[in-house]
Amino acid sequence: MYHIELKKEALLPRERLVDLGADRLSNQELLAILLRTGIKEKPVLEISTQILENISSLADFGQLSLQELQSIKGIGQVKSVEIKAMLELAKRIHKAEYDRKEQILSSEQLARKMMLELGDKKQEHLVAIYMDTQNRIIEQRTIFIGTVRRSVAEPREILHYACKNMATSLIIIHNHPSGSPNPSESDLSFTKKIKRSCDHLGIVCLDHIIVGKNKYYSFREEADIL
């Protein structure tokens, strides 16, 4: 359980932010500023505390649904929507920090970027990163989103955009909605298949990365097939 102490000096978080700076405020104080007001029976700091007590760690905050937020007394539709918008904006800011890096320097660097984008998806997404000779990203493209009837992409779909972008190399990334990045037999088979197809066209398949919840698996780092 996410443990919180409600401090007496946290009663005026806006004033504390002005006096001390945002980095000196607790998580519940920062959230209270975003919520702005409480209700007659419950001060805003008590509401923010209850929200954070509903999660095991701050990393799970983004997983709260609108319905879960609205189940907390004092959080209506407007406040829940504002919270979700704030979380999405924070996610995009974090993503933009990664996007500033022109070159893909390591599988770990790319995996951390893609965990932010795909780690909480409920469906399987397969993304291709197309690069030039300097490993600079030409295009990032979602090739498909898995459905009940289809959960495997065809190499020709991936290579079509590689040729269109005149890419010299590519990296494949997909997520496991289960949260575990451990590869399946079909993941292994697909990786071998896409490598053969890339080799045939003179395109380098640098890696196939599987992302889960805060974890990743790199075929380049872990297996001997790329």
Swiss-Prot record:
Belongs to the UPF0758 family. Zn(2+) binds at H174, H176, D187. Residues 103-225 form the MPN domain. GO terms for biological process: proteolysis. Keywords: Hydrolase, Metal-binding, Metalloprotease, Protease, Zinc. It comes from Streptococcus agalactiae serotype III (strain NEM316). Pfam families: RadC, UPF0758_N. CDD domains: MPN_DUF2466. One of its GO terms (molecular function) is metallopeptidase activity. InterPro entries: MPN, RadC_JAB, UPF0758, UPF0758_CS, UPF0758_N. It comes from the Bacteria. This is UPF0758 protein gbs1168. A motif (JAMM motif) lies at residues 174-187.
